Amino acid sequence: MKIYLVGGAVRDALLGLPVKDRDWVVVGSTPQEMLDAGYQQVGRDFPVFLHPQTHEEYALARTERKSGSGYTGFTCYAAPDVTLEDDLKRRDLTINALAQDDNGEIIDPYNGLGDLQNRLLRHVSPAFGEDPLRVLRVARFAARYAHLSFRIADETLALMREMTHAGELEHLTPERVWKETENALTTRNPQVFFQVLRDCGALRVLFPEIDALFGVPAPARWHPEIDTGIHTLMTLSMAAMLSPQVDVRFATLCHDLGKGLTPPELWPRHHGHGPAGVKLVEQLCQRLRVPNEIRDLARLVAEFHDLIHTFPMLNPKTIVKLFDSIDAWRKPQRVEQLALTSEADVRGRTGFESADYPQGRWLREAWEVAQSVPTKAVVEAGFKGVEIREELTRRRIAAVANWKEQRCPKSE
């Protein structure tokens, strides 16, 4: 029995990045031998075991053979005669097909070290094309390591295009697509994930609402980058700088979906694109089974982001009504989330990357003023039933009006 550290732990250590999870491959052993040594078997489809002390995963070396469609259509073979090189060959990228023995020596049968040095994401073998999930995984790795200047090898991107055009992505379940997307949204450069999907044709298949934005112009005065698709990726990049939250980043990604519905004869204007985009947000989220909390914020951002941009022009009643509409009294975090997504929208434009966004500050200040109005005082004043809400709203409007007169200019 020989044990090797494999995959991401080896890769990230060589890149000087923190190692989160360690996976091991066991060569020359059997399930019974692992059980006798105190390991706990957890793998149903192939032999994976948990170490009795560390609880890290130890998998018997195995090979895979395509036996059906999609990313689950594989038959696994695990036996003592499967070599380390056999096991590494089934992996997606050369940089993930690295192993380390107990002496610290790196085993690199597929030039993963060279590709690490050259910052290349390259597939190990043509078997890459048998698993459509790998298209999303490579896009995610491209986003994860974009800050290290990694790029996808030309032949790998070409294979991803072939897989997309062959309809392989249609075998992916909504849950897996969302899971990869959610993971990509946590990276430092999530916009790269969607750019890669567009480069290989997968964006049109998996995210048609976003793909439809490319080639749709916006007024050059407000959008020097012109193209709404480019603007969308720029705003996502900015959102990633402003917030680590997946819901903020996803909502920013979806904020302009309504512009894809504007008839070409009305370009570059997009009046009413916010409310129009709400239906597309719902459509996308229902298809991918996006969690409700993330979906709800994306709907609100699509509907109200333009309203935030005009904040100095809003009357106090409209401001308080906005807080009602986003359910801020029960979910106060939405005020901050709306401020961040709106700021990402403004700064996600060519030449505006460092722009100030006072509307975000005013939104936060107005919220602090509105929520500081005490409900207890209204009750103690003798109001009852529905009168309490009505009087509370009146007092909130008055408080915001007083604040606005002192702190918020009438135009910007």
Swiss-Prot record:
The keyword Hydrolase applies. SUPFAM superfamilies: Nucleotidyltransferase, Poly A polymerase C-terminal region-like. Mg(2+) binds at residues 21, 23. It comes from the Bacteria. Magnesium is required for nucleotidyltransferase activity. Nickel for phosphatase activity. PROSITE patterns: HD. Its cofactor is Mg(2+); Ni(2+). It catalyses: a tRNA precursor + 2 CTP + ATP = a tRNA with a 3' CCA end + 3 diphosphate; a tRNA with a 3' CCA end + 2 CTP + ATP = a tRNA with a 3' CCACCA end + 3 diphosphate. Comprises two domains: an N-terminal domain containing the nucleotidyltransferase activity and a C-terminal HD domain associated with both phosphodiesterase and phosphatase activities. Monomer. Can also form homodimers and oligomers. This is Multifunctional CCA protein. It comes from Escherichia coli O81 (strain ED1a).
